[in-house]
């Protein structure tokens, strides 16, 4: 008679990558992703923003990590009843696209691009930005991330760009924009300024060695200075110096040709150092560093005055380039000058330093900037014209030496900002730009930030909060080509000034009388009109050349993606801010920040309510993943080898989701370990269920009515795990959710299934056996739904299998044009087409038996600790031991499970005691990190008292040295007395077990019998016998086994479904060793 099989034939050794490919086909052919959205029509929505990547490069592990996190919460919120639209987006404008195009076209720089043609250049950018779009879709789909590519928004689309124009005009109307010439970080390689936050992205700072030089400036007012000194000292008229020189130190010698002032600290002490009728002025704290250069012995006494006394003195320019510049070449006191590196005197070049510009402008000194867009000196510095500034340092030093102004050159190692696109060192340079007045509303951003739930939580007030507190005005214009043009037109005649700012295509079309098909340059640049404010009619309104900083466009994503306010106005108002957003932690200076700036300025609301800042992924040695270093595998290769679920678990169960680093090896060993230790145990439970349910022709059902103690326990653990997963994901904590899954399957496999094997294996198909199958089925089905967002493809496979459908069979049906019946979403439905169309399980009708869980967990703890002791003492599990002594206050509960404990750890007797003090003492372990912060001055006394045992447990808490410790400041650990062997603590260090390790001859014989059972079971497996086959057994041994067979023969036969016989032709023969004695084992199927 053929058995009825209710489940697919499931292999224990499965190719998870191949299974995942079948799952992807099933989802695509059956349109599961779209159904997961459609089935939730009418439900409340969960909104998350998909940060737009560039498509001119392949995705890396960082992109995949972010994608995994997005997918987990989108899937989870869907099965929690939310409608979750998932729209992909592309960042298209900006430097990444331009630099790639320059490389491909073989051109470089603004002049070369202009000569090539802006239209042709931008057309190339337009094509190149989507170069890898299909590859992106391949990677994203393979990682099992559900997202809509067909309706993806692009920042280069006309509708998106129009929303950006609207935002700009709104800011303009709110008086939150201004134009100014200010010193900014400047990329001479890209010929564009950068925002201050762009210098904080990723590893923008690099260690760099520069030449730092000290130069002397000759002061003009010799008589005046002599007078200042003589007021403070006994100096006589004949002691007057002929020349005074003030020493300044700089790490940027190339800025010295543009020097216009010097700055000193008001309260800093400055020394007058005499050397050969020349007096050098330097901060007193820096004199020792210049002893050699100034010829000092170290025994000299110097006149000292405060820096404020030097204010107003003038000096001779180092060079004659700007010698007639008004109000220049004077000394000013300022608070930003500090002692430390250098001389305590700072040279001011207002065209190349932000502090320099602010100070000089306050003194009526206009800046000069003799460096062009490519970082080369202009004709204002004729002897350096065309020289790149960094290449000019040595030439300048030589000239200073020739002039007698040079004092010293040093090699100075410091962290210096580099361009995030070209990796070239930045310069600071005055450039004209449009700015958002962030400083005007930064306090409001700080307030709105308190409404956001940040993960990790300390980002709110530290990494992001402090950044907001120190926010500066944001430069949003770039003198580049491929980007949304600033909608600003100016009169070309300063006699008739006028500025027009446009916030829509309609406004532009109305004023210029043309149809706008493309907002990009050069088409938009060609739009001109007569200046309405010019009565002569001769001046013309022309658009300024600049385009938007691409970060402004990224920050406009919430409204730009839906063409707000020109379309979807009601939808946007109802769906803003987003419920969720995720990117890596540096985006606190990037996308998160620009979203916050624009959301606050435009809507006075935070842009999102929950935000995960994940960490970065590095190679196994802690280095950044790099094509050049070849230190990471192509993700697709990893997917094809281990599957993407394994990589998902590896990443999202690690600390990287808490903002820390994740080191991943190139060979994928870490991912393989995840497969082996996390996913395979889940599969093993599924495999066990299907193979034995099919063998017994039994079908499992969702049923929680069994009163079997193991069933009640595992179902209670199931509900606890389901609740924990829900709680964790509600709190945006995948790490804890994955731990809950792993912990549950550890108990399911290594406790419930193992302790229930006799129920599954027995011949009778009674209620107890059916309850076991129902319980295991219920655990698998409920957990499959609960963990479906965490392990989407393996969960789908198991879910389908539990409904007697192999994914391969489904795909065959679909390929033949046969459709699967779609069941409506309903809690009462036993089956939906996909696990991802189910509702999250609540198990509301089942009550957790907490008392049983607590007791059984202690039983499990006792057994696992006992087995660990056996392993440590090299005593195999099949070797029986005489007894275990359990010393606990909860022995009454444990006694109900005495037989289970005896069987599990293989002991004959369990002894219960409660006199713990006779076997162990409690040792106080202090949490130094927490306690040290609260009681730093008492720590030494507390440590000494803890070592001496001078503490007391009171009703108020643990008392020591006159203090009551908080529960998180200490732990009490049971420490068994040294003469007692075979011990372990359990029940949170409140109880002790002692395993009797003495072996008698009787115990040894029984251990041999159990070994023989194991040998026979292994032979059955190798002979490929079915689990139900009965067999003949013959044992041929070098030593006499008759006593063992006489005493334990029935036990051996029962365990192996065998009968002892001789003189038969075996199906399988094996040779094994029992305590160094050879045994030949023969088996034959009956």
From Swiss-Prot:
- One MF term in the entry's GO annotations: aminoacyl-tRNA deacylase activity
| Chain span(s) of sequence motif 'KMSKS' region | 624-628
Example GO BP: isoleucyl-tRNA aminoacylation
Q: Which cofactor does it need?
A: Zn(2+)
Q: Read off the InterPro entries from this record.
A: aa-tRNA-synth_I_CS, aa-tRNA-synth_Ia, Anticodon_Ile_ABEc, Ile-tRNA-ligase, Ile-tRNA-ligase_type2, M/V/L/I-tRNA-synth_anticd-bd, Rossmann-like_a/b/a_fold, tRNAsynth_Ia_anticodon-bd
Q: Where does this protein hold ATP?
A: 627
Entry EC number(s)? 6.1.1.5
List, alphabetically, the SUPFAM superfamilies matched. Answer: Anticodon-binding domain of a subclass of class I aminoacyl-tRNA synthetases (SSF47323), Nucleotidylyl transferase (SSF52374), ValRS/IleRS/LeuRS editing domain (SSF50677)
User: Motif 'HIGH' region, which positions?
Assistant: 53-63
Q: Which domain of life is it from?
A: Bacteria
Q: Name one GO cellular component term.
A: cytoplasm
- Give the matching PANTHER family: ISOLEUCINE--TRNA LIGASE, CYTOPLASMIC (PTHR42780:SF1), SOLEUCYL-TRNA SYNTHETASE (PTHR42780)
Q: Its family? A: Belongs to the class-I aminoacyl-tRNA synthetase family. IleS type 2 subfamily.
Q: Relay the domain remarks.
A: IleRS has two distinct active sites: one for aminoacylation and one for editing. The misactivated valine is translocated from the active site to the editing site, which sterically excludes the correctly activated isoleucine. The single editing site contains two valyl binding pockets, one specific for each substrate (Val-AMP or Val-tRNA(Ile)).
User: How does the annotation summarize its subunit structure?
Assistant: Monomer.
The protein depicted here goes by the name: Isoleucine--tRNA ligase
* Species, as recorded: Rickettsia prowazekii (strain Madrid E)
Gene name of the encoded protein? ileS
